Amino acid sequence: MSDVSPPSSLRVFPDTGALLSMLIFPRDRLGNPTLAGEVLDLYQQGAFALIISRAVVDELEEVIDRDFVAYRSQVIGLLAPRANQFTRWPTPEEIAATLPFTTAPEDAPIFAATVVAQSDIVLSNDFRAFHTPQAKLFWAGHQIALESLYGLLCVLGRRQRKPATDPSP
């Protein structure tokens, strides 16, 4: 991860899972870029600004310590040069305001941090928490677009959205 700020004004806020995928799983077993790797490559090319919250980093460190201990020094090494650029933790009031829109209270700090960061896009593949109808109301109410890794690649012109299928017989 480069610590050079890209010229783009598009502010993309990755949730913990998206950031984890970008840092630990940018390539598959054959060395080909994963969706997360393609997003990381576009960031490194300056296609968007990556906005990282202290709340996401704290949660990421917990996940690394629990599930990916072997990657701890690598992840810390990639994030440390950017530590002074992390956005602040949301206040208890900011977190509480998100609770009606979250399916799990532990996601509330990340929802609030996205707003604090003044993000254009929240990047998440967590469809159980970030892509629910109530979460989509939250994002829309704060004028924040919600995209998956694939969706962000569509926004950036690297993929095409699949047409919606007609469920009628």
Residue ranges with predicted function:
Residues 1-50:
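Short, well-structured N-terminal submotif of metal-dependent ribonuclease cores
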Residues 1-7, 72-73, 78, 111, ...:
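Short amphipathic alpha-helices and their capping/turn segments at secondary-structure boundaries
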Residues 16, 54, 125-127:
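Short secondary-structure boundary segments
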Residues 19-20, 57-59, 129-131:
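Short, active-site-adjacent cap segments at secondary-structure transitions
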Residues 22-23, 63, 133:
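Residues that scaffold the ATP/ADP-binding catalytic core of kinase and kinase-like folds
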Residues 39-97:
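PIN-domain endoribonuclease scaffold, especially VapC-family toxins
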Residues 84-123, 127, 131:
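Active-site neighborhoods of divalent-metal-dependent phosphate/nucleic-acid chemistry enzymes
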Residues 121, 127-169:
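Acidic, PIN/NYN-like endoribonuclease modules and their adjacent C-terminal/linker elements
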